[in-house]
């Protein structure tokens, strides 16, 4: 698999279908008559919201069309395995999207697409549309953060214990830049960060990973990670009654399984904490609520607890460094690429300055307090 998922978007491999091209593909591959189409954001692929003129046999009339970049489209077995995970999770009560099959009964179709200046082979999938509000648009309460931590743990646990697939080894993705095992690869891209102080923090994070985490990887419990539970990939719906003092939500959808890879339970927790900190008004305590939810399903071992602080810093560093690098090569996508950077550098600097002991104290005491009062 490509080492850096952004590189595909930066080497003219990112899909760029017009809406007319997308409509033609949908109608020819799936027999879906399109009533409305609109683009959806994507890092290195292309997504469209589709509304059809009539319901399918399952009562569905809303879809998401996903066109995968030409680099990742070379790995059809991985894309098919990701789709199988979605089907598996749906059957086990997780609100994930379901694939819509082509007229030929396939879950994806590799299409040769003519862009005029170039011809590319890109995988096309149609998935059911999940209604809901992205978590990024609501104020995350302790309750929803707990539920998200619990959901993250449940997903990994289900996949580790019960997911069977002939191409499961596809999730061993080697040098995949977004796997926390590959934190050291960030040095190749750190030159994109120009500020000396920030460069030093990134190098400190990588060195701490290599010193305190890497030697202990074999102590962690292995699983398949979703790997990208950010606040745009989690949908929620309101559960509170009109007039309630505080709005309450429940998780109504989990999106985007393209970063799945073999990792460890503690990786999923660190990734989820990092993303839940990004938009929070109380980022340090937010980590504690996620931790409480995760541990309600998968209690951490001492070795895993000891690595958590370092791994959260690693994920901040991955996201921030790769965003800077990607913007240099793809400036027209800056607004989307830099979502994390708006508050991410501040949060990473805070964690770095406070240090492991002080941050862990807040996380674990917050988790214990939440459990004791709920």
From Swiss-Prot:
<dbReference type="InterPro" id="IPR050249">
    <property type="entry name" value="Pseudomonas-type_ThrB"/>
</dbReference>
<comment type="similarity">
    <text>Belongs to the aminoglycoside phosphotransferase family.</text>
</comment>
<keyword id="KW-0418">Kinase</keyword>
<keyword id="KW-0963">Cytoplasm</keyword>
<dbReference type="InterPro" id="IPR002575">
    <property type="entry name" value="Aminoglycoside_PTrfase"/>
</dbReference>
<keyword id="KW-0808">Transferase</keyword>
<feature type="active site" description="Proton acceptor">
    <location>
        <position position="228"/>
    </location>
</feature>
<comment type="function">
    <text>Catalyzes the GTP-dependent phosphorylation of 5-hydroxy-L-lysine.</text>
</comment>
<dbReference type="Pfam" id="PF01636">
    <property type="entry name" value="APH"/>
</dbReference>
<dbReference type="GO" id="GO:0005737">
    <property type="term" value="C:cytoplasm"/>
</dbReference>
<dbReference type="InterPro" id="IPR011009">
    <property type="entry name" value="Kinase-like_dom_sf"/>
</dbReference>
<protein>
    <recommendedName>
        <fullName>Hydroxylysine kinase</fullName>
        <ecNumber>2.7.1.81</ecNumber>
    </recommendedName>
</protein>
<dbReference type="GO" id="GO:0047992">
    <property type="term" value="F:hydroxylysine kinase activity"/>
</dbReference>
<dbReference type="GO" id="GO:0019202">
    <property type="term" value="F:amino acid kinase activity"/>
</dbReference>
């Amino acid at each position: 698999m490509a080492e850096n998922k952004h590189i595909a978007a930066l080497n003219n491999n990112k899909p760029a279908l017009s809406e007319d091209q997308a409509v033609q593909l949908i109608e020819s591959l799936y027999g879906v008559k399109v009533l409305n189409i609109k683009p959806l954001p994507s890092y290195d692929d292309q997504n469209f919201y589709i509304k059809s003129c009539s319901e399918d046999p399952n009562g569905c009339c809303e879809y998401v069309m996903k066109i995968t970049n030409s680099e990742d489209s070379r790995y059809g077995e991985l894309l098919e395995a990701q789709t199988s995970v979605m089907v598996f999770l749906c059957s086990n009560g997780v609100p994930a999207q379901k694939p819509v099959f082509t007229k030929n009964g396939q879950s994806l179709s590799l299409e040769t697409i003519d862009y005029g200046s170039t011809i590319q082979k890109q995988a096309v999938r149609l998935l059911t549309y999940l209604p809901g509000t992205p978590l990024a648009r609501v104020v995350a309460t302790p309750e929803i953060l707990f539920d998200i931590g619990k959901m993250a743990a449940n997903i990994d646990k289900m996949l580790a214990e019960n997911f069977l697939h002939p191409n499961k080894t596809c999730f061993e993705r080697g040098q995949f830049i977004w796997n926390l095992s590959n934190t050291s690869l960030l040095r190749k891209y750190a030159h994109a960060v120009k500020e000396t102080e920030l460069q030093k923090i990134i190098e400190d994070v990588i060195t701490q990973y290599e010193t305190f985490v890497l030697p202990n990887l074999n102590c962690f419990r292995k699983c398949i990670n979703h790997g990208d539970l950010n606040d745009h990939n989690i949908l929620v719906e309101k559960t509170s009654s009109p007039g309630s003092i505080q709005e309450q939500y429940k998780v109504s959808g989990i999106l985007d399984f393209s970063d799945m890879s073999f990792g460890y339970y503690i990786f999923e927790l660190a990734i989820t904490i990092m993303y839940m900190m990004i938009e929070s008004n109380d980022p340090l305590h937010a980590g504690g609520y996620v931790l409480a939810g995760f541990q309600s399903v998968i209690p951490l071992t001492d070795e895993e607890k000891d690595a958590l602080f370092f791994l959260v810093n690693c994920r901040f560093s991955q996201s921030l460094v790769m965003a800077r690098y990607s913007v240099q090569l793809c400036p027209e996508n800056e607004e989307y690429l830099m979502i994390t950077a708006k508050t991410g550098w501040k949060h990473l600097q805070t964690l770095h300055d406070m240090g492991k002991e002080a941050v862990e104290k807040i996380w674990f005491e917050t988790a214990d307090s939440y459990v004791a009062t709920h």
